[in-house]
Amino acid sequence: MAFKDTGKTPVEPEVAIHRIRITLTSRNVKSLEKVCADLIRGAKEKNLKVKGPVRMPTKTLRITTRKTPCGEGSKTWDRFQMRIHKRLIDLHSPSEIVKQITSISIEPGVEVEVTIADA
């Protein structure tokens, strides 16, 4: 069989738009908000659809322990706590553009988790 020329030009495949959720967690609020602002600014420069940052409830981890190691003396206690702050950012874009946006410098102590789903 011979190849038939139909006269049609090949159609470029559409770039797949994904729903991307970026989860940021940190113990320091200032560095967390700075990274959020940088990510959102980068997404707005690329004209992407952005939702967030959604501020999730702060988790407070508490430990109460005796001050004295030997058990002698009055019963005095130390109370320690650590607060973990969390932000969610949703983007609707191709995954290649998100790689460019997330390549910004991220503050130390901020953990970034990227989840990609089909739109």
Swiss-Prot record:
Polyubiquitinated by ZNF598 via 'Lys-63'-linked ubiquitin chains when a ribosome has stalled, initiating the ribosome quality control (RQC) pathway to degrade the potentially detrimental aberrant nascent polypeptide. Deubiquitinated by OTUD3 and USP21, antagonizing ZNF598 activity. Ufmylated by UFL1. Keywords: Acetylation, Cytoplasm, Isopeptide bond, Phosphoprotein, Ribonucleoprotein, Ribosomal protein, Ubl conjugation. The gene is RPS20. InterPro entries: Ribosomal_uS10, Ribosomal_uS10_CS, Ribosomal_uS10_dom, Ribosomal_uS10_dom_sf, Ribosomal_uS10_euk/arc. The modification N-acetylalanine is found at A2. Signal peptide: none annotated. This is Small ribosomal subunit protein uS10. The modification Phosphoserine is found at S93. Component of the 40S small ribosomal subunit. There is a cross-link at K4, K8 (Glycyl lysine isopeptide (Lys-Gly) (interchain with G-Cter in ubiquitin)). The modification N6-acetyllysine is found at K34, K75. It comes from Homo sapiens. SUPFAM superfamilies: Ribosomal protein S10. The keyword Membrane does not apply. Belongs to the universal ribosomal protein uS10 family. It is found in: Cytoplasm. Coiled coil: none annotated. The modification N6-succinyllysine is found at K8. One of its GO terms (biological process) is positive regulation of signal transduction by p53 class mediator. GO terms for cellular component: cytoplasm; cytosol; cytosolic ribosome; cytosolic small ribosomal subunit; extracellular exosome; membrane; nucleoplasm; synapse. Pfam families: Ribosomal_S10. HAMAP family: Ribosomal_uS10 (MF_00508). One of its GO terms (molecular function) is RNA binding.
